[in-house]
Regions:
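Active-site alpha-helical segments that house and flank conserved acidic catalytic motifs
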Residues: 8-15
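RNA/tRNA-interacting regions in translation and RNA-turnover enzymes
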Residues: 16-24
Length: 208
């Protein structure tokens, strides 16, 4: 039951990232690379195959999804990406050797997607807005209000995801102590708190 809840939550969180050119593909690429590395560390070719195929697909897709995007994943593509990442993570977790801190390392790989989902839910709850209605209040929208460019938003979230994926992978590989997994989690929580201070439900500033 916990696995099902986790897969559904992560799938939906990644689907919500499709709000700006290149963001879902960038974050998904980084996350898939982390999962592929974790599966490869255990020498499990079968578990490494789904993230490997998704990684290749996302890299190719990103070439056409970078700003200005010529194609977009849409609901089907974003949900599929999230489902493959979530289910691959669940499979790697289930097959991980006991000495691996997989229970904390693997969820860290989805830090950016989960942070965005948390930001949206908290923001809409505080503003008494429908939780399931898109209101332009994601991380991408708030960064744009800070005048970060569209490609810049994808780069920022890619670096954020990269830091989380690197930490989670090193913890899984037993290079870092499991406590280090709290670093990206704590940092992401602080980022969410800071992003909540950026107005999301007012008209954006007019630029020339």
């Amino acid at each position: 039951m916990l696995a099902v809840i986790g897969i559904v939550a992560v799938t939906q969180a990644f689907a919500l990232l499709d709000t700006s050119d290149g963001v879902l593909a960038t974050v998904g690429t980084v996350t898939a690379a982390g999962l592929l590395t974790c599966a490869a560390l255990d020498g499990r070719a079968g578990l490494a195959l789904p993230p490997a195929v998704l990684l290749a697909g996302l890299i190719g897709f990103l070439l056409h999804n970078w700003h200005p995007a010529r194609i977009r994943p849409g609901a089907c593509g974003s949900l599929f990406t999230g489902f493959v990442l979530a289910s691959s993570g669940a499979l790697v977790l289930a097959e991980a050797p006991p000495e691996r801190a997989a229970w904390i390392a693997l969820p860290v790989l989805a830090t950016v997607a989960l942070a965005d989902a948390a930001l949206v839910l908290v923001s809409r709850r505080r503003a008494v807005r429908p939780l399931l209605q898109d209101c332009g209040d994601h991380i991408t929208h708030r960064l744009r209000r800070l005048r970060v460019t569209v490609p810049g938003v994808a780069v920022v979230l890619g670096l954020w995801a990269g830091a989380a994926a690197l930490t989670g992978t090193l913890v899984y590989a037993e290079v870092l102590h499991p406590a280090f997994a709290l670093v990206p989690v704590t940092g992401s929580a602080a980022a969410v708190v800071a992003l909540l201070r950026i107005p999301a439900y007012v008209a954006p500033p007019v630029t020339a």
